[in-house]
Amino acid sequence: MNDWIAYFGPQNRYRFSLGELKITDDNLSVFETGHCRFLNDRLMVHDDRFIMVIDGLILNRKELFNLYQTDDLAHLVVKMREKNPDDFFQAFRGPFTGLFVEKNTHKALVFTNQTGDSAVFCYQRGDLSVFSSNFYLLSQFLKENRLPATFGVQAAHWMLTFGFQIDASTFIQEVHRLLPGKAMYLNNGCWSEVAYHRFQSGDLTVSEEEAVEQIDGLFRQAVKRCFDKDLEYGYRQHLADMSAGMDSRMVNVVAQALGYDKITNISYSQTGSEEERLAKRAVQHLGNKLIFGTLDPHEFIFDLEKLTRMDFGTYLYCGITGGERLLSKIDFNAFGAEQTGQLGDIAIGTFVKTASNAVNPSAVRCSNWLPLDSRYDVNPEHFENQDLYSLYTRGFLGAMSSWFVRKNYTFALSPFIDVDFMGFCYNLPLDYRRNHRLYWKWVKRYYPDALTIPTSRKRIPETLFEKSVDFGQRGLHKALRIGHKTLHGMGLTRSSVSARSSMNPYQYWYDTDPAMRTFFNEYYSKNLSLLDDFPETAAEVRAMFESPVILDKIMALTVLAARNVFF
């Protein structure tokens, strides 16, 4: 897949051997890398009036063509900008980034999409401003041109405490990420950053029945946008994720209801796990084909630097688990985009359990082993409640980071993050979304057959009988967990997680695989000295690696890999 990097500054002063120079003007150069599988959604135009760059997928491109009565993307952008000069791109849906320059006024803007599945990274120094859709490429541009680049200790702290970047920080201190829903504007020679879109919590006055009806209509529209993109490019066979959860199967169920019948599912997990069993049952129930990737042996654990480079150090390196290795083996001549159910659990649900305007950053942390550094603001975007804070940090900046890895093979899509769908859901009263209350009502009303497919997501018990059974099952599971933890503490079990049967039993692997322990220990010992100039970060990495919890060690190694890969 392709990426772009552009710099505003003196022409011919800077070089970039990893990209092909596509556009050059008085003070702007644009380079392109890779290859594009979706050319009709790609724009790289330079004429006497404008410079236009768009990368990604515009899922509602044909809708906009009909609205503006054109069938040319460049012409569409010009007409949209005439109507909305500052934020025409807010009407786009999908994973996109872009750049627009009006040559006679010397005005420019750079933008990213609303939901974090695409990104723009920015570097500014003196008369030079560099923007790129790929953080690794930007790091190499800085290195090749010997431009100042300092290790980002704040990004390291976020990685070691949250497991992902909760703000615009990157592992290069001089580079910041343009956050979801934001754009950069050049006016009178000065750049400014503006939010053009932000989801809002609301209390929309609508009954649950009306809400369910609108949810179904908007979700079907979102699924259609995603799957029609495959058909636009002649891909008759759709590639769709399938897990043990509810979200991926609802994408598949609704897609089938809309007539998309040629679906191949992809799934990956530990052999013999509940994840594998439930995912395969769902595939069989729906009559789809299946490409399954086993996580044993867990070879992706050793792809430390490769995965860190691919996800730009935005998330702990193994967040995608075996997904990258499985995608690398798929022949994408037969498939278009990767259809996923990403963030479905918070679109019609929520990360929070109680309504509160207070923001608790610790609620989205992957680890509480280290204290948060009081020098850093944990809520720089001033989110007004936990619901939105969790959506943007844990959701858009955390979970969506795996899409940077996936983009090396194809674009990933999810109807749950469709802006129209998600915007409606977040305007509903929180009580509707809590405990997936509205989610289950939607499925029960419109897709009752989906409830016959076993899932790892538990329904909230409704009848007295269901509540009594649920109470007994939870008591049994709790007793088993406590018993296993006690045995582990006595040294009578090898792993603190009885989860060899879970999807990603990291602790089990670490406890039972000498090669994994050797790899972790050797990488840590060999690379800790890279942080000699950053003693506070080195101390935090040391503390995390010495933690008995495997996830803490993974977070520590991610920081060391970032120090290696981006410098």
Predicted features and spans:
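Short, flexible coil/linker elements and helix-boundary hinge sites characteristic
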Residues: 9, 19-22, 69-71, 145-146, ...
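Generic structural signal of hydrophobic/aromatic residues within well-ordered alpha-helices
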Residues: 64, 76-77, 138, 155-156, ...
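ATP-dependent adenylate-handling active sites, centered on carboxylate activation for C-N bond formation
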Residues: 12, 106, 188, 198-453, ...
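PAPS-dependent sulfotransferase catalytic core
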Residues: 355, 449-545
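Cysteine-centered catalytic environments shared across enzyme families
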Residues: 1-242, 246-294, 557
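Short, motif-level signal for alpha-helix interfacial/capping segments enriched in acidic residues
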Residues: 94-95, 395-398, 492
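Short coil/turn segments at secondary-structure boundaries
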Residues: 89-92, 169-178, 230-235, 407-408, ...
